[in-house]
Amino acid sequence: MDNAPPKGMRDFAPEKMIEREQTIGIVKSIFRKYGFKPLGTPAVETLDVLNKKCGDEIAGQIFKIADSELGLRFDMTVPLARAVAASNFARPFKRYVIGPVWRREEPQKGRLREFVQADIDIVGCAGMKAEAELIACAVECIRALGFDKPRVKINNRKIMDAVFESLKIPKENEFAVYRALDKLEKIGKKEVEKELDAKGVEKPKIGAIFSLLEGKGENDAKVAVVETIAPEGAAEMRSLLSLLEKYGVDVEVDLALVRGLDYYTGPVFEIQLGGGIGSVAGGGRYDKLLSMYGQPDSAVGISLGIERLMALLEEKKKAGEEKKTYTEVYVAAVKEEFFDDALKIAQKLRSEGIACETDLLGRNLRKQFEYANSSGIPWAAIVGEKERNEKKVTLRNFVSGEEKLVTISDAVQLILAKK
């Protein structure tokens, strides 16, 4: 019997889960700081809901539940649209959600079949203020995780829509062209050109598209190039650039950025950190999606890829810095007869907010220390005959090797001072 998890999915040992929970905790605290509220939706949705606007490629990646009309969610945006349509939340509705999604695609670096997304969305705000706040919040999250140079790229689907219209690319081909262009960084220009050719886009039109996408210069110059052909998209771009400057966020206009999902209708954006792992965050405006679920409204969101961030954090991490446990103190009884004393001490420490463990197996002191060391617990509070009589503990720091007899209250102060 093979006990490995399914292809493209992983188990996480305690030390890895601690890292993940710490990362998610940082992200969640910043989401809340910006006023986003939690919203929970099921992991399973009806296929009718999931297929509304996902496109053929994503539709083929949905994990379907046999003999039912249900499937696992492939992102957090479609469930949001359904939930908002079923509710009457005050506007603007600012929501966050952090949880797993599933896509049946070929696993590779930074891309799994089960992965955690951390999403924030704003429903009911049509202006660029929502986009600016989302991007600023995401950038703050990434900086708080120790990445001080996030690369933010923005574009606007209205610009590309206008370009396609000027080139007389049929409406029914637009989404296929978007999906091909979205693969530019992954498969390169030549392969994208082949895909566009296969979709029936004539070579002169392909050349015109790439002439625009490969435009050089500062942000103002790039926007100026499309101002005549796409005035609305260009105006939104200038407004967003101005707002992001007020947030202190540096951005790059990238006319090649399209994002592959079919539901985007306006600004789109990505955040990259290098490391050969693609974008760590991305999103955009999807004003038409909610109307498909019966409640027309404006909406925009951004998603942080926790798996990709964790992979980059793993690369950054120095040897020996891995935190294996939340436990701060191992309360060790010299003999089994002192277990009750150890239990009382542990409860006292816990009441002070200090995470503790006691021995549940009746092991001798040496084996208790071996367990504490291997678990990465930094402190031991030892209780025996002397400690019981003096109402104290022997506090040992496993890192420094220092050991002293102290009162419980002094032990609390020493441990908290090192937190």
PLM-predicted stretches and their roles:
Residues 1-17, 66:
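Auxiliary tRNA-acceptor-end handling modules of aminoacyl-tRNA synthetases
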Residues 114-118, 154-162:
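Short, conserved phosphate-binding/catalytic loop or strand-edge motifs used
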Residues 149-158, 177-178, 252-258:
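Short, surface-exposed recognition loops or helix-turn segments adjacent to catalytic cores
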Residues 58-67, 169-189, 273:
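Acidic, His- and aromatic-enriched active-site or binding-groove loops in soluble protein domains
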Residues 165-170, 203:
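Phosphate-rich ligand and nucleic-acid binding surfaces
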Residues 16-34, 45-46, 75-89, 95-147, ...:
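Positively charged, Gly/Ser-enriched RNA/tRNA-binding surfaces
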